[in-house]
Amino acid sequence: MKIRENIENFERIKLNKVAKFSDESVGRERLEEPDEIRTCFMVDRDRIIHSKSFRRLKRKTQVFIRTYGDHYRTRLVHTLEVSQVARTIGVALSLNEYLIEAIALGHDLGHAAFAHIGEDVLNDFLPGGFKHNEQSVRVAKKIEKNGLGLNLTKEVLDGILNHSGFSNVSKVAGTFEGQVVRFADKIAYVNHDIDDSIRAGILKEEDLPKNIIEILGASGSERINTLVKDCVFNTIDNIDKGEPRVSLSKEIGDAFVQLRKFLFDNIYLGKYLEDERKKAEFILEKVIEYYYNNWGEMPELYRNICEEEGIHRGVTDYIAGMTDDYCTNEFNKIYIPKFVMY
């Protein structure tokens, strides 16, 4: 018996009945021979980690643009924190940890430069709109490996596609593992963005709404602990009642929504980031404008997309893959004069 089959058999003994068993995956778009030692979701995890798009996350903004401190989150650090939170919840629920890890590590592969500012600019540019979760799937299916894609399992792609959305009416992933990542993403970013905001001097601990802090906890670690435990125990209750879904309790969920709204009002859309937001928008818009008019200068992969799917699509894919630094350097290369000594 192969090592992979031993792992799959162990899943049958260990995992919850609502988990996604690796040997029940609906598969990939392109058929492949199974790996001898890794399950299909382990293979997906490894492909994501070794992809160029994953490495570029270290140079993409989470919230604070061009911060020079060593401890502010980048998109890569956010991704790793999401993976940690999601795996903690998943192990407590006896779900498939490898599927959770693959979805969590891949969920932001398509995020643009300059955080959600890049997403907003590309959304205005691309007919039909731009969403980072959809772009993450596109990166995995079409952009990576020079257009071949990573050929991930459909469960991982589904989890990546449906990790966004905060309301109860948002579409959810078809697996419990995907639903866990959706909550872990929110738990991670709300709490680490508060931490970064305090580090940047925008917020003080005492600025946080007292009624919310009394429910969720005074520190970041306390809030994460509260949210993770509530998610685990409330989900167990749901399963026991025949309602198989991942969720928070009403009290904790309502407090969490209020805390997120506080962040949007005071940080994401607040005055502190307004000037930097305008600068980032200007850089992105000018680089987009240049390559829209000169798309023949883009790498071959994106030129081919322009010919097959239109210039807007090809330029969007190229810009979305840029890091903050690369996009800024492109702007400087295109628009800033080079000073030459005569």
UniProtKB/Swiss-Prot annotation:
Domain (HD) ranges: 75-190
Disulfide-bonded cysteines: none
Keywords per UniProt: Hydrolase
One example GO MF annotation: triphosphoric monoester hydrolase activity
UniProt entry tagged with the keyword Metal-binding: no
Cited InterPro entries: Diverse_Catalytic_Enzymes, dNTPase_2, HD/PDEase_dom, HD_domain, PHydrolase_assoc_dom
Family matches, as HAMAP family: dGTPase_type2 (MF_01212)
Family assignment from sequence similarity: Belongs to the dGTPase family. Type 2 subfamily.
NCBIfam families tied to this protein: PRK01286.1-2, PRK01286.1-4
Protein's UniProt name: Deoxyguanosinetriphosphate triphosphohydrolase-like protein
Species this protein is from: Clostridium perfringens (strain SM101 / Type A)
